[in-house]
Structures are given as C-alpha cells and as structure tokens.
C-alpha cells in the first residue's frame, strides 16, 4: 500500500506520469470537463471532498511551477482565493477570465472534479521539475 499523502489510484497515476509543463485542472463540482481530457471524479456529495483539501493533497505530490486562476475567484469566492494563495506560496499565479480558464483546461492531461459547490473554485497547475 502507498504510504504518501495521495492515495487515489487514478490521480496517483496521472501525477506520476506528468512531465514538465503538463497541466492538471482541479475544479469544483460544476466545472465542465473538455472533450478528450481525462476526468477523475472524486465527488462524493456536496462539499466532499473540499476543493482546498484536494489542492493541498496534490501539491504534496506534484512539483508545480505555475498556476492559473480565474479572476472572478477573488471577488466571488474570497475564502478559496485566500486558501489558494496560502497553499501555492511562492508559485507564480496568472489570472484569466473564467471562460479563458475553461479554454486552457482543454490542454490539460486531466481534470479532477471535487465535491466543492462554491463558485469559481478552480485552478490549473503546471508541472515543474524537481531538479
């Protein structure tokens, strides 16, 4: 059995297979998954698992060099914005419109659907390198 933080098999496979520059989307329950992008659905019920819990878990496993967040998040969901700022630390964050975030999502290797049912709880993580 795995001993590290990330236990979900499908998500572990995706993270382990990501290369430098690959994109991973973590989204709320309502974020659409573009055609051709692998969906990893973690949602059990509204709020479970929470978006920030999933982000924190993935950040423990994935080297991230940059992130993309919708600019609407700061205004419409300040708690998520504050949580992302805390979790991402010094990772550079680009803000785009929610529509642009959905367009960029089409280039992701996977989209992780959480049980989060608050607006604009979405982030795109760009994989970095550990050396």
Curated annotation (Swiss-Prot):
Pfam families: RbsD_FucU. Pathway: Carbohydrate metabolism; D-ribose degradation; D-ribose 5-phosphate from beta-D-ribopyranose: step 1/2. It catalyses: beta-D-ribopyranose = beta-D-ribofuranose. This is D-ribose pyranase. Belongs to the RbsD / FucU family. RbsD subfamily. It comes from Symbiobacterium thermophilum (strain DSM 24528 / JCM 14929 / IAM 14863 / T). It is an enzyme of class 5 (isomerase). Substrate binds at residues 28, 98, 120-122. It is found in: Cytoplasm. HAMAP family: D_rib_pyranase. GO terms for molecular function: D-ribose pyranase activity; intramolecular lyase activity; monosaccharide binding. It comes from the Bacteria. Catalyzes the interconversion of beta-pyran and beta-furan forms of D-ribose. InterPro entries: D-ribose_pyranase, RbsD-like_sf, RbsD_FucU. One of its GO terms (biological process) is D-ribose catabolic process. Its EC number is 5.4.99.62. GO terms for cellular component: cytosol. Keywords: Carbohydrate metabolism, Cytoplasm, Isomerase. Homodecamer. The active site is at 20 (proton donor).
